[in-house]
Amino acid sequence: MKKEIQVGILLLLIVTMGCQSGKKKSESKAISEEFPSEMVNFKPYNNNPVFSGSNVNTWDNLIRERGYILMENGNYKMWYSGYKGDENDPKYLGYATSTDGINWIKYEDNPIFDKKWTEDMFVIKNGNQYYMFAEGENDITHLLTSIDGVHWQEKGDLIIRTTNEEIIPAPYGTPTAWFEEGKWHLFYERNDLGIWLATSDDLITWTNIQDEPVIKIGPEPYDAGAVAVNQVVKFKGKYYIYYHGSTNPNWANPNENALWTSNVAMSTDLIHWEKYPNNPIVKGDHSSPILVYDGKNYRLYTMHENVWLYTSE
């Protein structure tokens, strides 16, 4: 009898372990279907950073916040924010190009736009025109347009309204635009405490889809202190949002330690988002992620405070 009991217990353990293993495999498969490897698995280039400020007494001694990279006709184009080094120094717009996404040449007449504080920019090309959404002074988003990506025209500050048409006071920054089926969408943050979504017909006046954030901070430590969107990508029928987060809600205090992270979330409707269970997607204090398709694979760049390159695993 004793031997039979022992055999029974052993069989029960085997069945239990098999069930647990099957459950883990099922969960892993579900994650990989929602977050394909191309979207989340990257390894750092072995000679980072690939771009940085001048580190001498120039207008772009340092770079900060999100820059943006597009690849067009085999050439990489980068827009970035430069400043002399003090947080209160105005931030101006720089431009650089590359044929391989590694070796960059700064435009000889930088800064290409210095009429207004311009940082944390997002660039999208629609038709024959480039649109840039950028933070101005005091985190007020403004719009610029260009035909060639170099010469920009200021179009004014954005106006964002609640669902009840009440104007939202500043700040509203880290703007990220998405254009689909004739409709413009804008993701933005307010003091990095959440990510909101609005739509517009004229690119200046925007109305919230809902007055609650579509992405909230937390609950995991990697984005418990702050969140802000950098980019939206559509891949195999799903939307992937690349965003940065902070571990510390007091990140603005220079005396506090705050780790900035690069993260991903997925949606099927731009409103309801599921965060990647294995966030953050890169190690260390590297944030403001931008995904670029090089013609064969996706590569990831983190833009703050130097530009790091990551390739697909």
Predicted features and spans:
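Hydrophobic transmembrane signal anchors and adjacent membrane-proximal interface regions, especially
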Residues: 2-3, 235
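Sec-dependent signal peptide recognition
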Residues: 3-10
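Hydrophobic h-region of N-terminal signal peptides that target proteins for export
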Residues: 12-18
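Carbohydrate-active catalytic/glycan-binding domains of CAZyme proteins
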Residues: 19-313
